[in-house]
Amino acid sequence: MLSCRLQCALAALSIVLALGGVTCAPSDPRLRQFLQKSLAAAAGKQELAKYFLAELLSEPNQTENDALEPEDLSQAAEQDEMRLELQRSANSNPAMAPRERKAGCKNFFWKTFTSC
């Protein structure tokens, strides 16, 4: 009987201490500022990581060019020039509208060819 009372008293005491510890938790403004700074730093690191990833993706050939020999560099430069010329020619001469096509042309419509 004595041990039952002792166990109940210890259980009640532990519950009171647990509730008291939770309600008396320090609400230190320095702790709150530290947590806010750490969250801001984590967000800043994510933005920094996104920036570096975008920078790496914007120039994927740079690391390849560093490892190439001078002959390969000239070949890569020629390929880049050809790519730029193709882009310029595609932009400067857009596809002709259907009304501007020549008189004898044929269009592929559905499964048959039709004349303009």
Swiss-Prot record:
Keywords: Amidation, Cleavage on pair of basic residues, Disulfide bond, Hormone, Secreted, Signal. It is found in: Secreted. One of its GO terms (cellular component) is GABA-ergic synapse. Disulfide bonds join 105-116. Residues 62-99 are annotated as: Disordered. One of its GO terms (biological process) is regulation of postsynaptic membrane neurotransmitter receptor levels. Residues 1-24 form the signal peptide. One of its GO terms (molecular function) is hormone activity. C-terminal amidation of the neuronostatin peptide is required for its biological activity, including for the regulation of mean arterial pressure. The modification Alanine amide is found at residue 43. Residues 25-88 form a propeptide. Belongs to the somatostatin family. PANTHER family: SOMATOSTATIN (PTHR10558:SF2). This is Somatostatin. It comes from Canis lupus familiaris. The lineage of its organism: Eukaryota, Metazoa, Chordata, Craniata, Vertebrata.
